[in-house]
């Protein structure tokens, strides 16, 4: 039966796009704006995605990531409460240390990925833009009686990334040089009180800076005045994170993928696994625990598919959604992210493949416009990380 309702009923108007505190600055800088996560965001500036990507890999790039959600969890029970929603060690996280985490559902699927930093009196949490309203509701519903869940819509978020990021930021406050990867602290930058973590989404050394919205443009201009720094859009952010082998939520991980399938078991600390002092106790713990146990016993990681990196010596980029087949043409998986890797000048991709084909060096084929593109399962990241660990 065909649906004719669309022809007779006017479509509901799309919700107007939100803007970040740097929107006017993006326009001034000549950005090409696109919708992303409900916001009007810069996808690139005049120099283009390739130049922006390479500049970030060699110097320093400034990204507006204010569309992401920032939340404070406050109260003596906050860490233990958060552990009921994530398979991650939060209780033992040291002061001003940061950790990657995952919200899971009852099936072991991933509701979102997030960053958690323990500060003196709270947990500072950053979640993805497209998920932030549901994440805040999730926190309030499940742990809102155990701790205070405080969204921070009045805070902007900037990311300064690249090997020269520390040089540029240290001109505003030399103390930031004391931070190492996945740590944070309170710093005054250009006269503005900020919370800074040494982390990011590019595979490079860099910083993420939470700043009051009303002073975000002042800080952005101070950073752009540094000779190493250029503004970078979401297009290069995507190619940078892909080369770094980092997942994009809603593409490489989602509610149908478990952390084991997503090759994210490194994010589940021993204390939260079977035999650990605080094993389980989070949504989907039975599913994820069983997959971990089977993997430990050599049963193909306990899953039938797994996320891997793919690299090709051919020139044709392989995009999200491309089917992956074996030498006989039998389907074995699908690409979830793909692009030319500007740093290595070869097509790279993330894909879920049958575990029988996930060994490093396995040759597979991506189907692009009915043509088979030879690809090889490769170790991640595709480009060495530049994180500063001290």
Label the predicted regions:
Residues 74, 104-106, 325, 367:
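A generic structural motif
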Residues 64, 113, 208:
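Acidic active-site catalytic centers that drive phospho-/nucleotidyl reactions
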Residues 76-110, 164-192:
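Internal amphipathic helical hairpin motif
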Residues 1-35, 41-45, 119-390:
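Conserved, structured C-terminal
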Residues 52-56, 106-113, 139, 193-197:
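Membrane-targeting and insertion segments and their boundary/processing signals
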Residues 88-142:
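Well-ordered mid-protein domain cores that form the structural environment of catalytic cofactors
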Residues 1-101, 109, 234:
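Acidic, proline/glycine-enriched N-terminal capping motif
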């Amino acid at each position: 039966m065909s649906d004719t309702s669309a022809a007779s009923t006017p479509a509901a108007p799309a919700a107007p796009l939100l803007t970040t505190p740097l929107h006017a600055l993006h326009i001034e800088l000549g950005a090409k704006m696109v919708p992303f996560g409900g916001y009007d965001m810069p996808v690139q500036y005049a120099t283009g995605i390739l130049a922006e990507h390479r500049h970030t890999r060699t110097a320093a790039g400034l990204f507006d990531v204010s569309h992401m959600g920032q939340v404070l969890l406050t109260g003596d029970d906050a860490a233990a409460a958060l552990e009921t929603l994530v398979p991650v060690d939060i209780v033992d996280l040291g002061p001003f240390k940061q950790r990657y985490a995952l919200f899971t559902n009852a099936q072991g699927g991933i509701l979102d990925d997030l960053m958690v930093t323990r500060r003196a009196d709270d947990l500072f949490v950053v979640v993805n833009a497209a998920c932030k309203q549901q994440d805040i509701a999730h926190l309030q519903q499940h742990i809102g009686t155990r701790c205070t869940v405080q969204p921070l819509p009045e805070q902007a978020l900037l990311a300064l990334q690249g090997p020269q990021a520390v040089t540029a930021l240290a001109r505003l406050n030399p103390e930031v040089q004391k931070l190492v990867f996945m740590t944070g602290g309170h710093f005054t930058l250009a006269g503005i009180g900020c919370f800074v973590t040494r982390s990011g989404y590019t595979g490079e050394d860099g910083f993420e800076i939470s700043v009051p919205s009303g002073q975000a443009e002042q800080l952005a201009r101070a950073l752009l005045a540094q000779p190493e720094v250029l503004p970078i859009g979401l297009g290069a952010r995507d190619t940078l994170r892909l080369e770094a082998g980092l997942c994009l939520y809603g593409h490489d991980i989602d509610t149908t993928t478990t952390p084991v399938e997503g090759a994210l078991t490194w994010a589940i600390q021993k204390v939260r696994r079977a035999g650990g002092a605080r094993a389980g106790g989070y949504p989907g713990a039975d599913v994820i625990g069983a997959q971990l146990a089977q993997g430990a016993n050599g049963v193909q990681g306990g899953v039938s598919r797994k996320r891997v990196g793919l690299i090709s010596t051919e020139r044709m980029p392989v995009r999200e959604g491309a089917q992956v087949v074996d030498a006989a043409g039998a389907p074995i998986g699908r690409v979830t992210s793909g692009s030319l890797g500007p740093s290595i000048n070869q097509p790279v991709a993330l894909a879920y493949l049958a575990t029988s084909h996930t060994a490093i060096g396995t040759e597979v084929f991506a189907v692009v416009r009915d043509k088979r593109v030879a690809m090889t399962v490769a170790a991640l990241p595709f480009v060495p990380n530049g994180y500063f660990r001290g």
